[in-house]
Amino acid sequence: MRILIEPNAHHHLNAGDAAMLQVAFRRLRELFPEAVIQVITEAPERLDRLCPGAEPVPAAGRRIWFNDRYFGDRLHRRLPGRARAALGRAEDGLRRRWPAAARAVLETKGALKRTPPREVREFLDAVGDCDALVVGGAGAVTDPFAPLALTVLELVETAADRGVPVALFGQGIGPIEDRELWHGAAAALPRASLIALREGRAGPGILRTMGVRDDRVEVTGDDAL
């Protein structure tokens, strides 16, 4: 069994974020002692101190996958605002609907530059081979962290598309006024097998409005406490 953890914070410098990652890793190790547990990280050595035995997955690959422009930054810079935004949406659509094609484009770009994107391959292999996706504790599904949240939600959908169970631990949901974030969350979160919340006052109602079933939501508190 292979479990992939998306910790949201990839440098592991924030004490609270690091504690939530440690708790998630420890619980998974106790439940599945034979599993291979991978963690997306910018700091493999720090990860090894926090979670001995965890396999690092390069966050650089994650960053390239979600941020790299298939038609090149130079073209984006030359386009006027609306055209640039439209091209960006088209590239995002390619990644979401046809990830194999998007991967091929990135690998071709890397080969032409003679810098094959090893990190992208390792990241996508981890996503494609995992038997479960776990999103670590965070208060990221909210307007101030919308760019990060949208990438996490896309990961949730990618796993769900493969029939892989998804669990989100220690989540703070909302407030959300950003329309793109709301639609992204409403598309992804109902597909999760479990969403554990930090609090029970606002989060359950927000999730219910998004179409998340009550039997998939638990109020567990903050994993760092």
Residues covered by each model-derived region:
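Aromatic- and Gly/Pro-rich donor/ligand-binding loops
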Residues: 1-175, 216, 224-225
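A nucleotide-sugar donor-handling region in carbohydrate enzymes
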Residues: 111-120, 172, 178-225
